[in-house]
Every structure is written in C-alpha cells, then in structure tokens.
C-alpha cells in the first residue's frame, strides 16, 4: 500500500502556466469578447420580433459560430487553471492568472447577458427562425431556454454591475472558503506519532478500522473547524445575502426557483422526489441502528457513521483499484472499459492526497482536447475505489458527448442529469463485487460501503437541503453567526437522521467545509445528487431487464443531456419523474440492501 497515487497530466493542453500558447489563447478569448460586442450591436440589436425568420436564422447561425469557438477556448483555459488551483491552493501564479482571466473576460460575460436579454425580447420570432435547418435549429433548446430565462434578468446596467461586483463579492467569498479550508491542517497522534494532516486526510479517518482513531479524528476535526468558523460564517453570509438580493431584484420567487430552473425540473418533480425520500427515513434509520448494534451501541455517534464493518481489512493499492474498475466496466460494455483504461494510461486522474489540494472528488471536461480530468483523494479504501468509478462515469458521460460532436452549448448538462453515468458506473462495480462474494463478512463490508453512500445521498442530502432552506430564509432578515449556522445544521441532522444517530454526537460544522454551500451561481447544490442516485438506480433496473440493447439508447441519452429538460429525457425511457412511483421503485432497490444488511 506504499504506492503513491498519480497526479494528473495536462501537458497536451498547455506545457505550463508560462506557455506562450496559454497567453495567446487568453488574449484571443478577450479579443473575441470585443468582437462579439460589436457583432451584437451591429447585427443583433436592430432585429426585432417582426424580423424575417430567414434573416433571423442567418444571424443566429453566425452568433452560434462565434459563441462556440469562444466558449470552447474559455472553458479549456478555465479547466487548465483549475487543475493547478484545485491541487495546490498555494500556487500564486495560477491564482493570479485565474483572477486576471476572470476580470478580462467580464466584458464578454456582460455581452452574453445582453444577448440573452435580446433573445427574450424577440422570443415570439424564435419558433419560425429555429424551424429552419442549420446550427440554430440544432441549438433550439438552448436558445429557447435562454429566451425564457431572460424574464429573470435585471436591467442591462444592473446586470453588468452585478457581474462586475461578483468578482469582489460572491465569487471572492467562494474562493476564500476554498483557500481557507484547503490550507487548513490538523495535528493528530497516529500510532504514537504526531502527524500534521490536511483536512481531507483527517476527514478520511472517519473510515479507519480503529474506533479510537475515528473518535479522535472526529473530535480533532470539530476543534479545528471551530478555529476558522468566523471567516467561514462570513463567507456563507456574504454569498447567501448576495443571492437573496439578486433573486429579489430579478423577480425570482426564492433561491430554490433558480435552482430548479438550472436543474431543468419543476417543483412537482422535486416535491414528489423529496416526499418519497422523507418517507424512506425510517428505513435508513433501521440501517443506522443495525450498524450501531454492531458496535454495542443503541444509536450511532457521528464518528461511527462511516466506520467499516464486516471483513474490513481489504485494502486496494491504486493498481488493484484500477484493475477492479476496468474488469467490471468491461462487463457492462467494452467501450466503457476502454475509455477508463485510457484515463488511467494517460494520467487523467489526480489521486494523491497532499497539502493544498481540495477535498472530495470531481471530474471536469477539457473540451479543446475532448478529454476529461478527475480529482480524488485515494486512500486505498473500497469507498475511494467506488469514488474513482463514480468520477470515471462522469468522464464517460463527457466522452459520449464528445463522440456525438456536441457543442459547448449542447453539452451544458444540469446537475440532475449529470449524475446519470456516475451512478451507473458505481452500481456496475458494486453489483459485480457483491455477486462474487461468498464470505458473509465480506458481503457485509461491501454492503456497508454502498449503504454509507446511499444514506449520504438520501438522508444527508435532505439535511443539507433543510439547512440551506433555513439559512436563505433567515439571511433575508439578518446575518447569521457561526453559532447559529451550527445550530441550524444540527437541527437539520436531527430532522433527517432522527433516532438513527446519537444526538450528543452530531456534526454541527458540516456547513464549514462542503463547497456546495458556497456557490453563488448554483444554490441548493444538493438535491440534484439525490435525483442522480435515484434516476441512475432506475436506469440500471431497466438495463437489467433489457440487457445489451439498452447500451445504444443509454449512450444516446448521455450525449443529449444538455439538449432537453429532465422530464422529456426521462420520458424516452418511459419514466415519469413527476410521479412518486418511479422514486419509490428506486428506493425499493436500496431497501433490499438494507434488509440484507440487517440479516447479516
């Protein structure tokens, strides 16, 4: 287990931060922003809702050609700079370039906002123009969506001011949270030696085999978060206050309103899903209590929530995890395995834990080279192996869109649909492993890993939803102290985990380190994960029924997730996401795992 996991390689994109090509591309994007503004004024602004459909179609085609080229290069530059910032928050040059690029491309963002407002004004003319063949027709969904969302724009001057202030406001608070938490380390005694660990490594000790270590890590973590709770509370207040103010001036009902539109679902869908999730809490509490009993406890303290059970000594070297993933991906389709092998072989994955690197995991596309890059914090556990499979699923999703030659706008997938492939890949690996197990204790350990993940996505995500909802509501009246934020967090955990957890040992500081709370653009960065788990689980059930002929339809779905709303995309598989039954059927799959866990 001494093998050091790899760091990612992006030298096929740029050779480094001082690469002249990077500088040239950044300047090109800036220049294109100026050209786009001139095009908007001369070629778009004079057009009205009465403009001839053929002329409007021609101008829209021209617009799309300009936008796609700029978006592709800007997205690639952003991903490249993020590859440094997310793995080394001490890299001042990357931070400087990132800030510089954001400032210099702000005029282009303002122009894009003006174009969206213009689309809203000519909305009545769009159907006829978009019916004509060509790029505009192929981007009908994106253009129509932009026109409909234009009703929630402030005046041009107000939107420009909001955009420019965001760099020193909401986005600055977001960046501060990331910097403060990624640079935070904690001293903890392990095996008689005092070690200084980055916080993600400390958090990963929640899955340590020794309860004494887990408890010490939990106590250390709470103590360390308390030392920086004030600046993090300021970040939370700054972002939520900004979002509330902007939503009010944009005519939004609340922060959830924009989150639903960005997720491309409606409140009926959310209510159906969240209602069924709430109904499932007793089932998950049964799992929590069964787990507690294995430790001689009536209820779980937080430090045992992620504890391994069963035959837990199984650890994976990075190469073993790779082999496990590739073999099981191949059982689904050789194409998935070939994609994943390429990701491993070409060092698309940054898996090493180290100071300055952010916690958690993510996958980002690098469109200029039609590739993805994956960040995780590999610690040889089955959980982190499953995380790697999950993120490779995101990469395969990107691969399917690149294979279908989707443009930047066509690839803009909402969070709800973004988890489709990742959950599928996780499920493939889990089901393959569990089907081969003969030892009940090993089966228990694998079920445990899966149920920890399921309970996080259903129960903990519900607590995050309740937390964020109350924070937004109370932030309208006043700022919230760090103590108040912790109280709201504990209250949300009690409402969801219930008697499954020991109320004396909850985690009141979960709000400090989850980056999802600090995104100024995407609020309620939580319920889409539950949607993804349950939608992916439902799709896997369809795959089990249909077999190999499911694969082409599945790939077509992945290639199209940026080109329709969630209800229409789901309907192509006969799924009604506004009805409770689909969500109940997906949770019934999880309940079978809970039943088996309790039997063991």
State where each predicted segment sits.
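Active-site scaffold of zinc-dependent metalloenzymes
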Residues: 354-381, 398-399
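Gly/Pro-rich turn-and-neighbor structural signature
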Residues: 301-359
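A well-structured
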Residues: 1-311, 599
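Short pre-active-site segment immediately N-terminal to the catalytic Zn-binding motif
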Residues: 313-318, 369-389
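Active-site recognition of the HExxH zinc-binding catalytic motif
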Residues: 251, 379-399, 422, 427, ...
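Post-HExxH zinc-binding segment in Zn-dependent metallohydrolases
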Residues: 412-441, 450-452, 456, 532
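Post-HEXXH active-site segment of zinc metalloproteases
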Residues: 386, 398-423
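C-terminal, non-catalytic "cap/extension" segments appended to globular domains
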Residues: 1-5, 11, 17-18, 130, ...
């Amino acid at each position: 287990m001494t093998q050091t996991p790899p760091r990612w390689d992006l030298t096929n994109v740029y050779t480094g931060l001082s690469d002249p090509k990077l500088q040239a591309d950044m300047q090109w994007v800036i220049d294109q922003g100026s050209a786009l503004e001139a095009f908007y004024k001369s070629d778009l602004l004079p057009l009205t809702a009465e403009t001839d459909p053929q002329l409007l179609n021609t101008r829209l085609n021209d617009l799309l050609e300009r936008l796609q080229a700029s978006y592709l290069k800007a997205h690639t530059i952003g991903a490249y700079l993020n590859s440094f910032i997310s793995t080394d928050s001490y890299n001042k040059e990357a931070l400087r370039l990132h800030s510089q690029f954001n400032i210099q491309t702000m005029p282009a963002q303002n122009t894009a906002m003006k174009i969206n407002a213009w689309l809203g004004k000519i909305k009545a003319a769009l159907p006829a123009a978009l019916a004509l063949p060509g790029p505009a027709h192929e981007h009908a969904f994106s253009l129509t969506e932009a026109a409909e969302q234009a009703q929630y724009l402030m005046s041009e001057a107000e939107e420009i001011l909001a955009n420019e202030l965001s760099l020193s406001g909401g986005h600055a608070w977001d960046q501060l949270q990331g910097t403060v938490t990624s640079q935070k380390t904690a001293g903890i005694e392990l095996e008689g030696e005092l070690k200084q660990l980055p916080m993600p490594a400390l958090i990963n000790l929640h899955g340590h085999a020794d309860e004494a270590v887990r408890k010490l890590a939990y106590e250390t973590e709470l103590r360390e978060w308390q030392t920086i709770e004030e600046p993090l509370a300021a970040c939370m207040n700054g972002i939520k206050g900004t979002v509330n103010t902007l939503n009010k001036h944009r005519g939004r009902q609340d922060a959830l309103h924009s989150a639903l539109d960005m997720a491309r679902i409606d409140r009926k869908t959310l209510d159906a899903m969240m209602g069924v999730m709430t109904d499932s809490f007793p089932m998950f509490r049964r799992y929590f209590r069964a787990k507690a009993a294995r430790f001689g406890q009536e209820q779980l303290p937080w430090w045992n929530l992620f504890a391994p059970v069963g035959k837990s000594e199984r650890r994976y070297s990075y190469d073993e995890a790779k082999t496990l993933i590739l073999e099981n991906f191949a059982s689904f389709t050789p194409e998935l395995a070939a994609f994943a092998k390429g990701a491993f072989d070409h060092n698309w994955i940054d898996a090493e834990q180290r100071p300055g690197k952010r916690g958690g995991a993510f996958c980002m596309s690098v469109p200029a080279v039609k590739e993805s890059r994956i960040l995780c914090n590999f610690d040889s556990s089955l959980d982190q192996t499953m995380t790697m499979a999950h993120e490779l699923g995101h990469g395969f999703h990107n691969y399917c869109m690149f294979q279908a030659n989707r443009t930047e706008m066509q690839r803009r997938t909402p969070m709800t649909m973004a988890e489709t492939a990742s959950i599928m890949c996780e499920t493939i690996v889990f089901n393959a492993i569990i089907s081969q197990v003969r030892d009940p204790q090993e089966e228990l350990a694998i079920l445990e890993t899966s149920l920890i993940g399921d309970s996080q996505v259903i129960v903990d995500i519900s607590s995050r939803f309740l937390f964020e909802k109350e924070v937004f509501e109370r932030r309208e009246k006043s700022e919230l102290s760090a103590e108040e934020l912790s109280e709201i967090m504990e209250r949300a955990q009690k409402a969801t985990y219930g008697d499954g957890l020991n109320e004396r040992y909850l985690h009141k500081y979960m709000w400090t380190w989850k980056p999802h709370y600090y995104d100024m653009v995407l609020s309620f960065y939580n319920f889409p994960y539950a949607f993804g788990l349950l939608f992916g689980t439902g799709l896997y059930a369809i795959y089990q029924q249909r077999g190999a002929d499911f694969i082409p339809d599945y790939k077509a779905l992945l290639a199209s997730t940026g080109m329709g709303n969630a209800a229409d995309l789901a309907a192509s598989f006969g799924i009604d996401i506004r009805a409770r039954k689909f969500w109940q059927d997906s949770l019934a799959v999880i309940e079978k795992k809970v039943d088996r866990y309790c039997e063991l």
